[in-house]
A protein has these predicted regions:
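Gly-rich Lys/Arg/Thr-decorated short loops/hinges at beta-loop-alpha junctions or inter-strand turns
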Residues: 2-8, 69-83, 142-152, 179-182, ...
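Short, ordered loop/turn segments at secondary-structure junctions
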Residues: 11-13, 41-46, 81-82, 114-115, ...
């Protein structure tokens, strides 16, 4: 044994596939044979600052446990939304973190997360370069928002898209039964990018045309045009279903919400109420039966309806991250590129973290129709392969069996 170790952590919002990436990292480490112990930091970067670790090499000892971890929703290691300061202003956290790396003989650190997590990867990488540390720091992408740059699509998005499309179809069936005029507004996550809301179009088939309208943050929202859209559609349909992103804004850039937004540590406004605001608008101006539905966290933790394509790619990205570290790559995020749409295929690579952190990928305007109330075929074609395939789960007492997480309880001593 060479006594070198590695560490992995997760942060940001959970997905149905982020544990598949964790499983991929663990699998890659076991195949590598270059690391004696794989530590898992509990609650992201805070786990290092609080010296709370798991020995994943012991806790995930076999293929059966690894496969169960792979299909478990949310984040096995827990999460945080902690923003590291600029080390030029205050390097105390960095000194502590890298002292921990030395203490545990960490030679590679893998951080699984979205935009804000990649900001952490960038800051740690810059500090490592400053102190000439040889620790390899690799970002492993995830986000249901699908807004990370330098990657065709992000792990977690495909499963969330599959859940949204399936839910939208089931909502449509629920509305089919009524012969009265009604409007159903479905609010879907997406602060700055409408990828998830666009995925609702995958619910359409040879008998279902819902959602009848899709409103995205990429196009300024016009209340009068929205009301005109609804009135016109009600002339030919009893039941109109609308998909709307939580982050829709008017031409002045103001959010369409029913409540005042608050911001997190990264300055992102925590939105709620776009669907409710539109419900009130329809009720006051059109007067038909109307309801709003906020899918909320269900869209990001529905492992029972995960995309097999998504989980497979998430796992492969975790494994590839380990290969990159072995090759000496650092200050990078592992990526995938779509090499073919029919048949669908991807290739794995990496990109410098500096071109990814603090950037966001929006839907191209040309993939949205001219009226800004639906998507074009190009976007549908992009989305379709990502939700393909079903994940097999083990059931007990009628519900799925997932990995227990006693280490995330406040009274647990690691």
């Amino acid at each position: 044994m060479n006594q070198s170790n590695c560490m992995v952590a997760q942060s940001g919002g959970p997905t149905a596939a982020i544990n598949a990436s964790l499983a991929g990292v663990i699998s890659g480490i076991k195949k590598s044979g270059k690391y004696d112990t794989c530590y898992g930091a509990i609650n992201g970067i805070l786990g290092i600052l609080n010296e709370r670790y798991l020995n994943l090499s012991q806790m995930i000892p076999d293929e059966k446990t690894l496969n169960r971890l792979k299909v478990t929703p949310a984040m096995y290691l827990g999460s945080c939304r902690h923003k590291l300061p600029d080390y030029k202003d205050d390097d105390s956290a960095y000194v502590f973190i890298f002292n921990q790396f030395v203490k545990l003989n960490i030679k590679a650190f893998f951080y699984i997360g979205g935009n804000d997590s990649m900001d952490t990867v960038l800051k740690l990488s810059d500090y490592a370069a400053k102190i000439k540390s040889d620790i390899r720091i690799i970002g492993v992408p995830k986000t249901i928002d699908n807004d990370l740059c330098m990657i065709d699509h992000t792990p977690g998005f495909g499963s969330a898209a599959k859940y949204i499309a399936s839910t939208m179809l089931e909502i449509a069936h629920d509305t089919f039964i009524y012969a009265v005029k009604s409007v159903t507004i479905v609010e879907i996550m997406g602060r700055d990018a409408g990828w998830l809301t666009a995925a609702s179009a995958l619910a359409r088939n040879d008998y279902n045309t819902a959602p009848h309208f899709i409103y995205l943050p990429e196009v300024a929202f016009d209340k009068e045009q929205f009301l005109t859209d609804i009135r016109n559609k009600l002339k030919t349909l009893n039941n109109v279903i609308v998909a709307v992103s939580e982050g829709i804004r008017d031409k002045n850039g103001d959010y369409i919400t029913a409540s005042k937004a608050v911001a997190d540590q990264f300055g992102h406004q925590q939105l709620s109420g776009a669907g409710k605001a539109l419900e009130f608008l329809v009720k006051e101006n059109i007067g038909v039966k109307v309801r709003s539905i906020e899918i909320n966290v269900l869209q990001r933790c529905a492992s029972h309806l995960a995309s097999a394509t998504d989980q497979s790619e998430a796992f492969a990205l975790g494994e590839h991250a380990v290969l990159l570290a072995e090759e000496g790559v650092t200050a990078s995020m592992v990526t995938l590129t779509r090499t073919s749409n029919t048949p669908y295929a991807v290739a794995y690579d990496h990109a410098p973290i500096r071109g990814i952190a603090n950037e966001a990928k929006s839907i191209p305007r040309e993939w949205i129709n001219a009226h800004g109330n639906d998507i074009r075929q190009e976007l549908y074609n992009y989305l379709y392969p990502l939700i393909q395939g079903e994940v097999s789960l083990t059931y007990q007492n009628g519900v799925p069996v997932y990995m227990p997480v006693p280490h995330l309880k406040p009274d647990h001593v690691s």
